[in-house]
Each structure stands twice: as structure tokens, then as C-alpha cells.
A protein has these predicted regions:
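Short hydrophobic beta-strand that contains or immediately precedes a catalytic carboxylate
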Residues: 51, 61-66
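Glycine-rich nucleotide phosphate-binding loop and flanking beta-alpha elements
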Residues: 69
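Bacterial N-terminal signal peptides
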Residues: 4-14
């Protein structure tokens, strides 16, 4: 009896870890680096090989939403601040800070403008969102884009680090500058 109880106790954590993450009704807040759902209602979830195929075909706009690291508020005034470099999937539009649970009006306008730029203003043009593996930011941005009326939305949960980990090339990214 004791052995059975110990065996059950050892197996339960694995069962808990294997449970699927539910999609929230709204947007997900912090912590953003956490297990993500299997998919996003209304979007097409793609994994590494499918994302690579879409990238090679060149018909889908790739959008990275990894946030920029903020300048520390307590940094002395005469200190030079250098942002950490960010590598991403080649040809990607980097729209940082657009995957948070709540966006400021400026961040919302930046996302809308970036989407118009990469889709030519066509809400039927396919657009793929990513960040890092197990990052809710790309899920939030894809969900928000669906709410804006875009109809061909892809979500790539493995993100840029999954891409790089598979040996696919990356390149330095700069945030998209809108006119």
C-alpha cells in the first residue's frame, strides 16, 4: 500500500505538467515567460517546420513582438545606455512592446501602423507572430490582431530561439520605424 502511494505521488507532478494550458478569455499578463496554450482560437498555430516553409515561400509577413529592454530608471545621467542586441528571423518586422496584456494608445497605434506596413493595409494578407519559446507576448499580439479584423493570422510559439536552436539563421533586428 505504501509503495502504491509513493508511486502515485511520484507520478502526479508529471500528470500536472502534462495538462494543457487553457486559453484565457482576454489577454495574458505577467509572467509572460510561461507555458502557452496549444493554439489560439481564430489563428493557425504553426510549428518549426511549417514556419520555415512559410518563411521560404515569402508570402507571409513575419512579426517579432519581443519587448525592448527598458533603460533602468536609476541609471546615472552621464551613463551611456546600450541596448542589448536582438537577433531575429531574417526579414522580420520587429514591433517591440506590442504583446503586453494592455497596450498604451501609442503602443496600440504602433501595432496598427506596423500591421498596415507589413500587409499593405490588406487584412487578408497572412501575418505570423512570434517572440520566444513559451512567451505569451506573441499570443497576445496575434489575438489582438484578430480583434482588429485580420483574418489570416499565424502564431509560431517556438519563436526566434526555437528557430535559432534548429540551426536556422538569424540576423540583427531593429525596431520597425513608422513614417
Amino acid at each position: 500500500m505504501l509503495r502504491a502511494a509513493l508511486l502515485l505521488a511520484c507520478l502526479l507532478p508529471g500528470v500536472a505538467l502534462a495538462q494543457a494550458v487553457a486559453e484565457p478569455e482576454g489577454y495574458r499578463g505577467a509572467p509572460y515567460a510561461a507555458p502557452v496554450p496549444e493554439g489560439l482560437a481564430g489563428a493557425t498555430t504553426v510549428h518549426l517546420e511549417e514556419a520555415r516553409r512559410l518563411w521560404e515561400e515569402g508570402e507571409v509577413a513575419f512579426v517579432d513582438v519581443l519587448p525592448r529592454e527598458p533603460k533602468p530608471a536609476d541609471l546615472p545621467e552621464d551613463t551611456i545606455w546600450r541596448e542589448r542586441p536582438h537577433d531575429s528571423i531574417p526579414g522580420t518586422a520587429w514591433l517591440p512592446n506590442t504583446g503586453y496584456e494592455a497596450l498604451s494608445p501609442e503602443e496600440e497605434a504602433y501595432l496598427e501602423g506596423g500591421l498596415r506596413a507589413v500587409t499593405g493595409g490588406d487584412p487578408t494578407r497572412p501575418v505570423l507572430f512570434f517572440c520566444k519559446t513559451d512567451c505569451w507576448m506573441s499570443w497576445n499580439a496575434a489575438k489582438r490582431t484578430l480583434g482588429m479584423g485580420y483574418r489570416n493570422v499565424f502564431w509560431f510559439p517556438e519563436g526566434a530561439d526555437g528557430w535559432a536552436g534548429a540551426g536556422y539563421g538569424t540576423e540583427p533586428a531593429e525596431p520597425m520605424v513608422l513614417p
